């Protein structure tokens, strides 16, 4: 097989130059603000990559993005595995899933001021992961273009889940007692 050959997986998701996966979470409130910014950057040709979105309950239409409300976890994991960049809301589950796969992540917290969440706890979550250099945290969407440029060279610290460590300790305890 030549270097330029394209491999098509069983699910027909082709490897293109770069794939961006966007996760908005399953919160009842809309997070269209993030998709509005992504669409703006697509229109300006800042984003030229294929974009796949799991939008949750956010209603958004775009001819430039492949948008799903929800997808089975297996399909989500398959797409995430193929992605080069994950742009996600500030939910721990989405962030940790991407980090465990070694993905570059831009995390954008949902904000109560925009009616995206009931409080601003996602700011603290994103800030914590950002300070530890696991991801690029972004509270102001005006900085998205800069964050995308930074992501090209960004080398996230390797994420090790403490949950995995605790499970191993419990398994060792059970096996040895």
PLM segments and residue spans:
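N-terminal amphipathic/basic-hydrophobic helices that include classical n-h-c signal peptides
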Residues: 1-18
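C-terminal amphipathic helix plus adjacent low-complexity
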Residues: 3-8, 150-177
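Residues at secondary-structure transition points
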Residues: 29, 70-78, 89, 116-120, ...
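A donor-sugar binding/catalytic signature common to diverse glycosyltransferases
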Residues: 76-116
